[in-house]
Amino acid sequence: MVDTDNDDLKSSTGSIGDLYAQKSSPKGGKPFHILGLHLKSKGIFEAYEWSKWWEKADANRKKILAQATQIRVKFLDPFLTDSTTSSPLIVCGDINDGPGLDACEKRLFGSGVERLMRMIWKPQLCLGNALFDTLSAKDKEEVDFSSIYTTTFKDPIFNDTYQREWIDHILYSKNQISEWVTGGQIHSKMPDGTPIYTRYKHASDHFPISVDINT
């Protein structure tokens, strides 16, 4: 249970259990670890009275924040500060949350992915974001993430309008001297240019993300 918004009420993290980072030893490179995540969905796909809808939306977001906080405090910080485990670390997966301040995030003063990425009092433990690194200098300066999205869906609340969301991330530790994670890409098409969803009708509605890793 975690107090996500300083209201003296604690939100359940659900079942996180033990977390383990898988060690990978690439040929010709130094070992690094990978932690794959899939946090609570924030989607609501049923009709509710408006105040009830907001209640459910806020509850989902609080659970994501609680899960992200537990992972940051109970796994990431200990892992990155332990001399026996402080090798390069990738944290990736469907975080089900993006950076920025949408309506719910304004109400809760934060997002799950930002909670995973940083603890402002421990800047040396902050994680980089591979897709943010690909933004133009102007978009970085203005903190404009609108060009990045990893899934699209019909929003039943707004007459099935297609929404674009950035909820899948590849984060990386900054405990290396050189840049070791580069070339972030979102893949919406097959190598021959065919959209993935037209080739594979039952594929995930999330686009694959890739990076180049050089340890």
Task: Write out the residue ranges for each language-model feature.
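Structured beta-strand-rich core segments of catalytic domains in phosphoester-bond hydrolases
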Residues: 1-42
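Metal-dependent phosphoester-hydrolase catalytic domains
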Residues: 12-15, 23, 77-90, 95-215
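A solvent-exposed, charged loop/short amphipathic helix patch at secondary-structure junctions
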Residues: 42-62, 115-117
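Residue-level signal for well-ordered alpha-helical segments
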Residues: 48, 52-57, 66, 148, ...
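A long, amphipathic alpha-helix that forms part
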Residues: 55-83
